Amino acid sequence: MTTEFYATPAFPVSKALQWTPPEQLELTPTQADWLLYEGSLTERLKQIGQQFSVKLLGQQLLAPNTEEKQRLKGKDQAVIREVLLYCNEKPWVFARSLFSPSAENANTLNLQQLGNQSLGESLFARSDLYCGDIEVAKVALEHPVARLNQQWFGINQRLLSRRRIFSTGGEQLLVSEVFLQPSPLYSSPNNRS
């Protein structure tokens, strides 16, 4: 995989976003199709991309932002994992996941061993997986992920993101995904982002 062009950002990359129920954003049919997709995003990307890979940006115990802390029931510390999902040798999605340190443990989800493997594949393979409601957000132009998108692809636009809580094995995980410019989410001619 050739990824030298896409310089690795400093970890952690992401900052807080303003999340809302999907019906509060005006989305094109293509945007809604991607943002509200209930299945594994990894599997969907693999179906349309000739090459799929994951690049781990970082995974460590940190303090979540205030809003994330509320969603994680007040936990002061969480393991924060940030990755880029590549299709056809381009980053299509920036993903940020938060979970308790116990979820890294081999006796639960064994997330410490994921490295450059997809969290989605691991989660959606579990029979006890519960998927919470999807929330969406527009990413401001000054957000670090939007700046990366501009740096990498020369396009200065508000990106779209989604997130939800997953529960499995007695653990909760908060997963957010920002769709970058090469992703099909922006292929609609009536793009309103």
UniProtKB/Swiss-Prot annotation:
The keyword Cytoplasm applies. Pathway: Cofactor biosynthesis; ubiquinone biosynthesis. Pfam families: Chor_lyase. It is an enzyme of class 4 (lyase). It catalyses: chorismate = 4-hydroxybenzoate + pyruvate. The keyword Lyase applies. Substrate binds at residues 81, 119, 177. One of its GO terms (cellular component) is cytosol. Its main location: cytoplasm. It is found in: Cytoplasm. One of its GO terms (molecular function) is chorismate lyase activity. Transmembrane segments: none annotated. Keywords: Cytoplasm, Lyase, Pyruvate, Ubiquinone biosynthesis. GO terms for biological process: pyruvate biosynthetic process; ubiquinone biosynthetic process. Belongs to the UbiC family. Removes the pyruvyl group from chorismate, with concomitant aromatization of the ring, to provide 4-hydroxybenzoate (4HB) for the ubiquinone pathway. This is Probable chorismate pyruvate-lyase. It comes from Idiomarina loihiensis (strain ATCC BAA-735 / DSM 15497 / L2-TR). The lineage of its organism: Bacteria, Pseudomonadati, Pseudomonadota, Gammaproteobacteria, Alteromonadales. The gene is ubiC.
